[in-house]
């Protein structure tokens, strides 16, 4: 496979918005069934006191944030949460722990039991536990784990301004450890942290050139949290999310593109355009680890409406959602 370049990605960024969306839709339709949206539920199994210094994260022990800290929860609590998620329509259950790395001993033993309980409910199991070794990855795979999430967050250059307690290469190493164990990879990033469009292009370039490409790619918009160094960052503009989703779909045609954190700031029209641009997975539930998420009923209505529009395959209907975005991407993208 030919390597994707930052220049190719930046050329996509500067296409007129409607042209970018229709290009992404055509690629999406060749690789996924119409109206296919994966619903993923996310729970925090260990909250706060993380030794990492990620500037966006309220779980870091480095910042004074109003956050209720919790030790590793019981396996039974995870099972009940997974049962509820399935009852509400989720088909993927994700567990996150505020750790720099997964530790051998009681921690890995506990999460292995959690994975087994989730799998017993016929749900996909995904976890994010920080760095993992090759041996740990193999143990998680043996327990039935389907996917490991480890985001690269941003470009290699901008990364140093956001995190100092873990290197970019260490993130790539964990991704490779999961991959070598036969676990599918979930890896994406965050926009709205003060990075440039060049940085966004570089982040997507790194993801697209992983071999193979990640099975899941979460695109997150920063949710500024009081007490973190990024508390005063302005909210990401709606068209920025659409651009990132559509571009990710074009360069990673077979990956699930997940519309992730920050959805609570997006109107139904914006979220609809993200889905029409190739997003085919959302986090479904009241919260994402420590931040609020969309209301579940609102999501049900959104997906119902999306399936109706998608079934019609009408450019006129899709253009209805483009009316509020009359400016071209060139007015948004500043290198």
Region locations from a protein language model:
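Auxiliary Fe-S-binding modules of radical SAM enzymes
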Residues: 1-34, 208-325
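Hydrophobic faces of well-ordered beta-strands that scaffold small-molecule active sites
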Residues: 37-41, 93, 125-127, 148-150, ...
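Mobile, glycine- and charge-enriched loop segments
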Residues: 35-51, 55-66, 112-119, 123-126, ...
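Residue-level signature of catalytic and energy-coupling elements of molecular machines
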Residues: 16, 54, 150
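Glycine-rich, proline-tolerant flexible connector loops at the mouths of alpha/beta enzymes
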Residues: 38-44, 64-67, 94-107, 158-159, ...
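Conserved Radical SAM active-site core
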Residues: 61-188, 193-209
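Short, charged helix-capping/linker segments at alpha-helix termini
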Residues: 322-335
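N-terminal pre-triad scaffold of radical SAM enzymes
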Residues: 22-63, 70-94
